[in-house]
Design a protein with these regions (language model features):
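Conserved sequence signature across two-component system core domains
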Residues: 7-8, 31, 48, 98
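The feature encodes the CheY-like receiver
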Residues: 14, 50, 55, 82, ...
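Acidic, metal-coordinating helix/loop segments flanking the phosphotransfer/catalytic sites
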Residues: 30-47
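Hydrophobic alpha-helical motif in two-component signaling modules
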Residues: 41, 49, 60-63, 67
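Acidic catalytic/metal-coordinating carboxylates
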Residues: 32-33, 58-61
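Short, Lys/Arg-enriched segments at the junction into DNA-binding effector domains
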Residues: 2-3, 113-166
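Charged docking surfaces used in two-component/phosphorelay signaling
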Residues: 15-23
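Basic, amphipathic DNA-recognition helix from helix-turn-helix-like DNA-binding domains
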Residues: 9, 64, 68-129
Length: 166
């Protein structure tokens, strides 16, 4: 069962999305402020729906700060329609941008598409570079001897890019 962290300061939207996605078999976590997001990501959601306009740190700042911690997809779900806001969202590490009002069915299709891509990425392979060095693309980790090294997303992406173009 996939889990979704829904982050929005509007209780009506939190309640509606929670009910909608629960009825479709998702496990739901919620956050009503930027600060609550930092507490909830420890539960390792499979995907995050993130509003921009929230009390405390806004969604852009939250995304920027958690992007090196989590590798799951982040979909901005916001009333901001300006192109600059969309660009800032993607630059902060967002994977998608949905403008309110939105269709729950379309949002579910986007969530499913992102989770499908994540699932394909997780089924990647391990590559042994020597007796002591193994890169596991599905777990996003490196094993050096008996030590397993978990890297932040950007650092692993750099290692993966370099290893695939050696």
């Amino acid at each position: 069962m996939n889990s979704i962290l829904i982050c929005d300061d509007e209780k009506d939207i939190l309640d509606m999305l929670s009910m909608f996605f629960r009825s479709r078999g998702y496990r739901i976590m919620t956050a009503g402020s930027g600060q609550e997001v930092f507490e909830q990501i420890e539960k390792q959601p499979d995907i995050i729906l993130l509003d921009i306009n929230m009390p405390g740190p806004d969604g852009i700042d939250v995304c920027r700060r958690i992007r090196n911690i989590v590798s799951c997809p982040i979909i901005f779900l916001t009333a901001r329609v300006d192109e600059a806001d969309k660009i800032n969202g993607f630059a902060a590490g967002g994977d998608d941008y949905v403008v309110k009002p939105f269709s729950p069915a379309e949002l579910e299709a986007r969530v499913s598409a992102h989770l499908r891509r994540e699932s394909r990425a997780r089924t990647g392979s391990k590559i042994r570079f020597s007796d002591d060095l193994i890169i596991d693309y599905s777990e996003r980790s490196i094993a050096a001897g008996d030590n397993v090294i978990k890297l932040p997303r950007k650092e692993f992406d750099i290692v993966a890019l370099l290893s695939q173009n050696r």
